[in-house]
Amino acid sequence: MASLPNGAASASAASSAAGGGPAVVDKEVDFANYFCTYSYLYHQKEMLCDRVRMDAYHSAVFRNAHHFRGKVVLDVGTGSGILAIWSAQAGARKVYAVEATNMAEHARELARANDVADIVEVIQGSMEDVVLPEKVDVIISEWMGYFLLRESMFDSVICARDRWLKPDGVMYPSHARMWLAPIRSDLAENKMEDLEIAMHDWNLFVEDTESYYGVNMNVLTKAYRAEHEKYYLKSAIWNNLHPNQVIGQAAVIKEIDCLTATVDEIREVRAQVTMPIKLDMTRLAALAGWFDVHFRGSKQNPATQEVELSTAPDVNGGTHWGQQVFLLTPPLKVNEGDNVKVSFTMVRSKENHRLMDMEFTYELHESSGKQLPAITTKIYLE
């Protein structure tokens, strides 16, 4: 998750194309709410310590050095500058490293310290506003957010591609997929317990306020509970799952070709999938979402060695992205041979285009032929 702001111009166009979605993005507000985090070294360190992330990008660049040798590279949202430095070390003639935040100065320092300052030019600013002196052969970016599309940074990558990538250029990564899978988990019980503790505390507060100050706050109890139900039960939960928590077949709900994708294609994601249950006598407590990206080059200019970066549950540990857990309330008892049918919709929040609102309609088709009524739930990826 690198740092680069979505310009007001592109956001306005996105809103117009949607027929009235989010308002035009205020860059100062967007920076304060989102990008400022990426200006801190502690946050950059968290990403740089993610071995899965680092190994995938390092392998993609150096195992496919022919894409970089003697070429012009654009790093969108360079952050610490690590991808720009690798691109230079792989033989790039010139690297333009665009960064929105003051992390740009640290990126310049790292380029100098690693003897590539003559190749890597760090440009602080919005990708939508930056003007390069030439077209580029490669666009490299670590733009992925939770469940791939949270943060909406891919918009800026698309803008960069459409403005600056040569017709025979390549994207790093070149492809991406979003996955959904049925899981078992105790998170629902834990979150329900947290909710009840919060409500118990509220009830004591109501009693004390009336007792000490003569004001009855009980009229707000319903709103307080709804607020906390959203937080505890209807918000996506970050988790690093173990593979044995996945109780059925995972399904791809979205595939993206980074060379051709448009903002319209990613502004709203819709899918209908059927996921067979593979474990007997268990409970479907939630759905889990993750993503993978691939470095394949292009048809005209393929990679010598394809590399995959996956954020799927892994016995060897996870990534800083983890997986997103979407609680299903109520959970369902399931058996091997049952099928879970899910209709999924994800759209950008009207309040903040970097956050996502999701709706799941799920129904269980038992192996006996019995079909349970469909249940619809809303989940917020914030």
UniProtKB/Swiss-Prot annotation:
What name does UniProt use for this protein? Answer: Protein arginine N-methyltransferase PRMT10
Q: Which domain of life is it from?
A: Eukaryota
Q: Could you list this entry's UniProt keywords, alphabetically sorted.
A: Methyltransferase, S-adenosyl-L-methionine, Transferase
Q: Does the keyword Transport apply?
A: no
Q: Name one GO cellular component term.
A: nucleus
A Pfam family name for this chain?
PRMT_C
Q: What gene name is given for the protein in this entry?
A: PRMT10
Q: Which organism is it from?
A: Oryza sativa subsp. indica (Rice)
Give the GO terms filed under biological process for this record.
methylation; vegetative to reproductive phase transition of meristem
The annotated active site, in chain numbering, is E142, E151
Which ranges are annotated Low complexity under compositional bias?
Answer: 7-17
Physiological role: Methylates (mono and asymmetric dimethylation) the guanidino nitrogens of arginyl residues in some proteins.
Catalytic activity, EC: 2.1.1.319
Q: How does it associate, per the subunit comment?
A: Ring-like homodimer.
Name the family the entry cites: Belongs to the class I-like SAM-binding methyltransferase superfamily. Protein arginine N-methyltransferase family.
The GO terms this record gives for MF are: histone arginine N-methyltransferase activity; protein-arginine omega-N asymmetric methyltransferase activity; protein-arginine omega-N monomethyltransferase activity
Query: For this protein, what reaction is catalysed?
Result: L-arginyl-[protein] + 2 S-adenosyl-L-methionine = N(omega),N(omega)-dimethyl-L-arginyl-[protein] + 2 S-adenosyl-L-homocysteine + 2 H(+)
The segment(s) forming the SAM-dependent MTase PRMT-type domain are 28-359
Q: What are the boundaries of the region Disordered?
A: 1-21
Annotated region Dimerization arm: the residues are 189-229
